[in-house]
C-alpha cells in the first residue's frame, strides 16, 4: 500500500524489563526474552544491548538447548509479557509502555534499562498515512497532523492529567490501565529517577531523557540509522530486501514531512 511516514508520535517510552532477581543484562544468558515484533525498534535496541554485554541473540524453538552466551528471542503480544514474566516462561521483555510500568506495579519485574538511554531520542511509534489521502485530500491530511501535534504538545504540558484521562478511571476509559501505572510513565516522581540512576536503568543522566516524550518531526538521520541497524539485526523470515536498501534514499522515499512542518509552525 503506498503510504508515508508523516510525523513521529512519541520518543523513548520503552524499556527492557527483567525478572526481579536479574540485575545485569549478562544474566539473561541461556534464557528467553520477549519482543513485540521482529521489525521493531525494540528488537534493534535489545540486540545492541546483548552485543554490548557479550550475548548472542538467537531464535530457537521453545525448549531448545541454548549456548552459554545465547539469548532466545520470542515474539509475544505486549499484554502477554507481564504474565509470561511472572510465570517464568521468559526472563525479560522489551516493549513500549505502560507494560514496563505494569510489571513494576505488580512487582513481577524491574526495569533493567530504558531504550531512550541506549538510543537517545529514538522514535517509537510514527504517524503513517495513505499516499492517496496526502495527494488527494491535503487539507484533511493537514488537519490530522495538526491535531496529532497539538495533542503531543498538550500531553507534554499536562502529563498527570493525561495519565488520568487515559486510565481506566478516566471518563472514556481509553486504556485498561490504572492511573498509578500511567503516572509512572507520564508523570514519574523525582525519587523514581534517582532509583533508576542508582540501578543503572539510566546511565546517561546528562541526556535528560523523559521516560516518554513527544516530538513530531521525523528526522531523516534517524531513519537512515535505523535502516543501517536493521541490516545487522537478527530477524525471522526473509530479510534479504534490507541488503538492497540505501539508507538515505529510503529516508527520503518513506517520509513526507510537508504536513508536520506546517503543523509545528502553527503551534
Give the positions of each predicted feature.
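Secondary-structure end/capping motifs
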Residues: 135-243
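Aspartic protease catalytic domain
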Residues: 243-244, 248-252
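C-terminal non-catalytic accessory extensions
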Residues: 253-267
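Short, glycine-/small- and polar/acidic-enriched structural segments
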Residues: 1-76, 81-87, 91-101, 108-121
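Electropositive, surface-exposed helix/loop patches at the edges of structured domains
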Residues: 22, 149, 153, 267
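Pocket-lining segment of extracytoplasmic ligand-binding domains
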Residues: 74, 78-186
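Residue-level preference for alpha-helix termini and adjacent loops
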Residues: 5, 15, 21, 126, ...
